[in-house]
Amino acid sequence: DLNQGKRFVGMSGVSNTSALAFGGQLNPGLTANTESWDGTSWTEVANLNAAKFIGGSNGTQTSALFYGGAPGSPGVATTESWNGSSWTEVGDLNTAREGLGGAGTDNTTALGFGGNNPPQAQTEDWNGYNWVEVADLNTGRTKMASNGTVTAALAAGGTTGSNTTATEE
């Protein structure tokens, strides 16, 4: 079990033996806590620079990104990069938002898409240095399931104001 009970957590990893869980919403409050999974147990490691939740995330246990999220409305634009031992704040999203989907393989490549209330279709591409706006989702949505790489991403479900079954790749 995680060392700290929380929801709306960022996560990265490519297997059930190597993962990272970070940030999240407590009851009450937020956390900057980061925990590393070794296939058997969670170990607390270096915290995020700022507590937040419900952001986009991607990567591995040793190279991850956490971008956007909350607190605040319409969310935050900050991006934090994990190098395997610590978090560093890097270039902000062009548009602050929460509830966005994320895809990417490490802390040098990512897509952040959708998010916010009302739901947005906006998509941004992280090139390792900054975010660039690219082709939007066909259906603006927030709080969707997401996965994949920058060249093969998937967004499924979420809410457009009501729950949706829309899937885009």
Question: Could you say what each language-model-derived stretch is?
Answer:
Residues 1-169:
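Polar, enzyme-active/binding microenvironments
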